[in-house]
A protein has these predicted regions:
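Polybasic, glycine- and aromatic-enriched phosphate-binding surface used to engage nucleic acids
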Residues: 1-106, 111-117, 122-134
């Protein structure tokens, strides 16, 4: 949907930035394993969003955006979010325990488990709590 820039009343400079968004309301219920977040989206320049979405981060290019999304879809990332997130609403505070990565590359759970030295038991626990994202 096109909107005239004059109707953008807040954070107008963000319109000119590349960003990764996620829905502020997460899917699912109380059953395990949880999904934690909806599918993240890459938004190019000349895009804006309403309160329905949360801007996770600004990126330099589409490749960095795709790599951030690859990180966000890992069980590791979503498990770290789940340590704080206790409602379906997602706020910036739920990312407090999520470590920042190098977004010049994509990420997998296996790489993250190795990077942070997780044991087989810790990995099994994470994978029992967080469902894979497609």
């Amino acid at each position: 949907v096109f909107i005239e820039p004059r109707y953008i009343t807040k954070n107008i400079a963000w319109k000119d930035k590349k960003k990764v968004l996620v829905s502020k309301a997460s899917p699912g219920g109380d059953e395990y394993p949880h999904s934690i977040i909806s599918t993240p989206l890459y938004a190019d320049v000349n895009t804006v969003c309403t309160e329905t979405y949360l801007i996770v981060d600004f990126v330099n290019n589409k490749i960095e955006g795709q790599n951030l999304i690859s990180y966000m879809t890992t069980r590791f990332f979503r498990f770290m979010m789940s340590l704080i997130k206790n409602t379906q609403n997602i706020s910036k505070g739920v990312f407090a325990f999520v470590p920042i990565q190098d977004y010049s590359k994509s990420w997998t759970d296996e790489e993250l488990y190795a990077k942070y030295g997780l044991t087989k038991e810790e990995i099994a626990f994470i994978e029992s709590m967080i469902r894979p994202m497609k």
